[in-house]
Regions:
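Acidic, Mg2+-coordinating active-site environments of NTP-dependent enzymes
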Residues: 6-155, 179-180, 205-208, 212-214, ...
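Conserved adenylation A10 loop of the ANL superfamily
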Residues: 12, 117, 263-264, 283
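Active-site beta-alpha connecting loops in nucleotide-dependent enzymes
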Residues: 141, 159, 163-234, 238
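Short amphipathic alpha-helix with an adjacent loop that forms part of the alpha/beta core around
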Residues: 246-252
Length: 286
């Protein structure tokens, strides 16, 4: 029993995270829709209208609100997306109106999240300008795509957790950096069950045309990322030991490089990041 009833529900994505326990993406959708059990009848349920599973949701007892980029029939749509100097700007079109929004982060996945937040604010009867101001003041929390400068190196901390979709999104972010070299440090993605090997390999294949110069993988499952990336990344190394990984990374990094760290929470890839920080002084990028 829910002691409190949420006023608004949000489901941002149906991917393959936790598929080991839920069996299929349909099983994941069913589990996420359990949020309705605690919501008041008629409350807004905000859904990603670009997701093939969420766009099929029909819940007549609730107010369905869709957001997206590709789907022209959503209620909140992002258009004219621009990335520059670590910021992303876009126009939100909604119910015949529009509002320009800027968020201090990059990556199309962050546009989706900002759209969901904008929709929440609107449902709470906030002024669009105030919603935009709030989004502009957003600060990423620890290990969730937080960007730092380590000497002359750009570090993208994004290892709070990982799924196939978020790994690919993180590679998109790394690819967007105008750096001397782009280095990806990718670890195991957990809870993928029978889809694990192919999911890791597909992440590796996703490096095609992403201009990733060096790929380091950590963990037994992530070796399949290395396999998938063959032919797309010039230098690939796999590690089972964090100390060896950290040592190799420190020997490889040069001023002007950008390095991404991404893995599931259980891999504790922040241990490698902390080894890097102990080796060199760092300041915030902004």
């Amino acid at each position: 029993m829910y002691k409190r009833q949420p006023d608004i529900g949000i489901i941002t994505n149906i991917g393959v995270s936790h598929i080991e326990y839920l069996g299929s993406r349909d099983g994941i959708l069913k589990a996420k829709l359990e949020i309705l059990e605690g919501m008041k009848k008629g409350a807004p349920l905000i859904l990603n209208g670009d997701n093939d599973k969420l766009v099929t949701v029909r819940e007549p007892d609730y107010k369905l609100v869709f957001f997206g980029i590709e789907n022209p029939n959503v209620d909140f749509r992002a258009k004219d997306i621009e990335e520059k100097n670590g910021f992303t700007s876009f126009t939100v079109e909604f119910y015949g109106a529009s509002q320009r929004v800027t968020v201090p982060t990059v990556g199309i996945h962050n546009v989706y999240d900002a759209l969901a937040a904008f929709a929440v604010g609107y449902e709470m009867r906030m002024e669009p300008q105030k919603i935009a101001a709030g989004l502009k003041s957003f600060v990423p929390s620890g290990m969730r795509q937080r960007i730092k400068k380590v000497g002359g190196i750009t570090v993208i901390e994004d290892c709070y957790n990982a799924s196939p979709d978020s790994q690919k999104a993180a590679l998109d972010v790394l690819s967007s950096f105008k750096s001397n070299r782009r280095i990806a440090v990718l670890g195991d993605m957990l809870e993928l069950g029978k889809y694990s090997d192919v999911s890791h390999e597909n992440v590796g294949k996703y490096t095609e045309n992403k201009n990733i110069d060096i790929l380091f993988t950590y963990g037994a499952k992530a070796k399949h990322i290395a396999e998938g990336a063959k032919g797309f990344v010039d230098e690939i190394k796999s590690f089972d030991d964090k100390t060896e990984l950290a040592k190799a990374l420190l020997e490889t990094l040069k001023d002007g490089d950008a390095v991404l760290f991404k893995a599931s929470r259980g891999m504790k890839l922040e241990d490698v990041i902390n080894s890097l920080y102990r080796a060199v002084s760092y300041t915030h990028l902004r």
